[in-house]
């Protein structure tokens, strides 16, 4: 792993896990419709920590209902479903009300993607200081929250 703090980039040259491949499939759809930042536990897994997870948390920008419908239709077309609701109006309403919604591969609730709009100013800032992770073997990139933000979140919010 190489970290360039000035460029806010990490280069990973490792084989992908099945979770990594699923994340890439999901994110390739998300990034066509919205900016995003992966946050929380999967970040440490991506960077080499060996632990299990049931979900991958991410913020997406606060997009319009029309853009969300396009995103949701593409997710469904690619085999994902929403665990919270089926109708786009309902799912979007959850997001607008500050709640997270979960998507997974159809009929496989785990692992899933917990998607949310940023609520607080500190959530919105994750987009400004995100780090780009290059997965060289997959020729792909993922945006994660900054390492400093990850540490602060774990220490002060989760108390771990």
Please state what every model-predicted region is.
Residues 1-160:
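Compositionally biased terminal segments of proteins
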């Amino acid at each position: 792993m190489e970290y360039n703090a000035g460029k806010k980039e990490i280069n990973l040259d490792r084989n992908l896990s099945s979770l990594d491949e699923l994340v890439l499939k999901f994110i390739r759809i998300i990034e066509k419709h919205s900016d995003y930042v992966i946050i929380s536990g999967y970040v440490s897994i991506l960077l080499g920590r060996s632990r299990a997870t049931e979900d991958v948390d991410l913020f997406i920008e606060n997009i319009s209902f029309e853009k969300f419908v396009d995103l949701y239709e593409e997710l469904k077309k690619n085999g994902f479903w929403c665990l919270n609701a089926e109708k786009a109006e309902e799912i979007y309403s959850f997001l607008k009300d500050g709640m997270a919604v979960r998507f997974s591969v159809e009929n496989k609730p785990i692992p899933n993607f917990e998607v949310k709009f940023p609520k607080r100013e500190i959530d919105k800032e994750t987009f400004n200081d995100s780090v780009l992770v290059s997965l060289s073997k997959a020729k792909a990139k993922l945006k994660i929250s900054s390492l400093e933000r990850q540490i602060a979140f774990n220490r002060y919010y989760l108390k771990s």
